[in-house]
């Protein structure tokens, strides 16, 4: 029997509708709409598409998107100057720096210059530290989006074994913290993990964020599992797939996210929700 689909498009649409109503309410009360600064350095095709989608999503819910498109040769010093201006601006509630950055710019340095209360990506050490201490405020968008998906479908991780494949600062590490916060027993696997198959086979929840296709063989999967595929890869024919072979996996597991249409839409709506949360906090 094919797996049940975890539909990120449907759930993100519901959350966007709710968010739009909240934004409209605050505007009707005489408050300005939340403002999100979206900074793009260079013209990497994938980044251009991601930024365009984020700006369209802002427009859809009534959040004001402030665009800053900078040339690829922009220096780290100039970017920090812009961030400092945005940190001080009363019109900006959230700052998003589209990653990856050009090689001459240090991502960690840039992230650390964003005010934690405007760090709507949730990457600042302060925000990650709060998550680790079980007192989160602005949380990384992809892991939180995944948790919201699981909650909607009543897929409870408490007392279950969750295996996270990938240990990036953006997904894998904060994902493990979210799962711990929700009461899961968590195993993190990465490029140095030996006997990866063994860990995959014993997972109740499998979150795959390797950034590479087919690291996880579909014959490792089991019928009771919930599989969350964070990967996104464009194939030569223009189609998009995830880290896992969906057509094979959907016949083997209990629940699975499609790619596209699973995690991606939830990441964007969570970014918008973080911006709204930041705006509310800054007005206090």
From Swiss-Prot:
CDD domains: NAD_bind_m-THF_DH_Cyclohyd. Coiled coil: none annotated. NADP(+) binds at residues 166-168. One of its GO terms (cellular component) is cytosol. Catalyzes the oxidation of 5,10-methylenetetrahydrofolate to 5,10-methenyltetrahydrofolate and then the hydrolysis of 5,10-methenyltetrahydrofolate to 10-formyltetrahydrofolate. InterPro entries: Aminoacid_DH-like_N_sf, NAD(P)-bd_dom_sf, THF_DH/CycHdrlase, THF_DH/CycHdrlase_cat_dom, THF_DH/CycHdrlase_CS, THF_DH/CycHdrlase_NAD-bd_dom. It comes from the Bacteria. GO terms for biological process: L-histidine biosynthetic process; methionine biosynthetic process; purine nucleotide biosynthetic process; tetrahydrofolate interconversion. The keyword Transcription regulation does not apply. Signal peptide: none annotated. Keywords: Amino-acid biosynthesis, Histidine biosynthesis, Hydrolase, Methionine biosynthesis, Multifunctional enzyme, NADP, One-carbon metabolism, Oxidoreductase, Purine biosynthesis. The keyword Hydrolase applies. The gene is folD. Pathway: One-carbon metabolism; tetrahydrofolate interconversion. This is Bifunctional protein FolD. It catalyses: (6R)-5,10-methylene-5,6,7,8-tetrahydrofolate + NADP(+) = (6R)-5,10-methenyltetrahydrofolate + NADPH; (6R)-5,10-methenyltetrahydrofolate + H2O = (6R)-10-formyltetrahydrofolate + H(+). Its EC number is 1.5.1.5, 3.5.4.9.
